[in-house]
Amino acid sequence: MQTRTRPLTTSLAARRAVPGPALYGEPMHGTTPRKLDPAGAQALLSQLFEPGADRLAHSIGVGRRAEEVARVLGSPDLLVSAAYLHDIGYAAVARDTGLHQLDGARYLSGLGAPPELTGLVAHHTEATVEAAERGLDGALRREFPEPSDELLDLLTYCDMTTSARGEAVTVDERFERIYDRYPPSHLVSRSMREAEPRLRRLVSGIERRLGPPPR
C-alpha cells in the first residue's frame, strides 16, 4: 500500500516520534488486528483517550449505534470501525490542524489504515463545511477522496444521534446540545448551522429506514 508523505509541524512530528499503538500489524492489548476490525478500533481508542473522557464515551456510543445499524441493514464492518474511530483526530497524538476529521484521517493513514476507512473518518458529518471555514477544504479533498454516500451517510447518522456522553439522542437534542456548548460566533457553531439542513434531511431519511434511535 502506498504511504502518503506530508510535512509535519515540529510539535506533531515530536508527538508522533513517541512509540504508540498501531492499528495494523503490531500488537495492541495482546491482539494483532491485521485487517479492518472493530475490536482493533476499540483497542486503539482505549489507548488514546483517558477512561471516562467524554470523547471516549461519545466514540464508543457512536460505534455501538453503528453496530445496531449494521445488524439491521447488513452494513460491513467498515462502518463500525469508522464509527469507533471517527473522532480520533481529537486525540493529543493526532491533533494538528484543528480539523479533527482531517487530523484523524491523517493519523490513521500513518498507521496503515486503508483508504476506505480514512475517507469515512475524513468526511464524516459534513466535514467539508468546517474545512472551508478553516481554509483546509482543498487539502481534505486532495488527500482523502469522498467515499461511498451510503456508508458516509450512515456514519454521519450515528454521530448525529449520539450525545457527547455516548447516549442515544434525537437530532433535535444533538443540535441543541452542540449550540449550548459553542457560542454562535464559534467556528464549530457556524459550521453546524450551515450544515444543519442537510444533516436533518440525512437523519430523517435514514430514520425512515431504521426507525428512530432507541431511548
Per-region residue spans from a language model:
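His-Asp-centered metal-binding catalytic motifs of divalent-metal-dependent phosphohydrolases/nucleases
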Residues: 76-104, 108, 118-128
